[in-house]
């Protein structure tokens, strides 16, 4: 069975799924977040993993932390499902699973991007505390679906080629 859509469709979907449960000053998608996460990452060979880290949201959605805990309390391990989908994605793309160092770099980049989103993108910030990570110097601005879609597809091709050229292929 194939649980993931073709990668082009998955990237298109990321361009359409809003972050922050729609609590936004302007349309801002998981695709834009994915591009920023990859850009923030210091290791060029690891950027494909950061770029694709939110692909499971195409299948399971992008629930907030409260929903994740509620689901877990009721027998649905969303994070576990996301990990499984990422494992399938790495196999599909002939990528080695990310190392612990790559996973940590994705986490650091994601936290930095989320802190910047809090400053630039989130509409009502009164309901919570700003993420503790440092923010980017650049301001996040609105970009159209077509722009994000094209940038995601180009970044995917570029980052996958770099990862494969560096030897980050799945062991057979």
Predicted regions mapped to residue ranges:
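Metal-dependent phosphohydrolase cores
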Residues: 1-172
């Amino acid at each position: 069975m194939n649980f993931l859509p073709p990668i082009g469709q998955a990237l298109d979907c990321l361009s359409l799924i809003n972050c922050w449960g729609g609590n936004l000053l302007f349309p801002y998608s998981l695709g834009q977040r994915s591009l920023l996460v990859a850009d923030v990452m210091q290791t060029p060979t690891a950027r494909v993993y950061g770029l694709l880290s939110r692909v499971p949201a195409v299948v399971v959605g992008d629930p907030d932390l409260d929903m994740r805990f509620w689901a877990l309390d009721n027998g649905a391990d969303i994070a576990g499902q996301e990990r499984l989908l990422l494992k399938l994605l790495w196999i599909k793309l002939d990528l080695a699973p990310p190392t612990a160092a790559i996973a940590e770099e994705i986490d650091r980049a994601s936290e930095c991007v989320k802190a910047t989103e809090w400053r630039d993108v989130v509409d009502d910030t009164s309901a919570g505390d700003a993420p503790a990570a440092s923010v980017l110097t650049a301001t996040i601005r609105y970009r159209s679906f077509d722009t994000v879609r094209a940038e995601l597809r180009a970044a995917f091709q570029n980052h996958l080629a770099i990862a494969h050229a560096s030897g980050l292929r799945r062991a057979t």
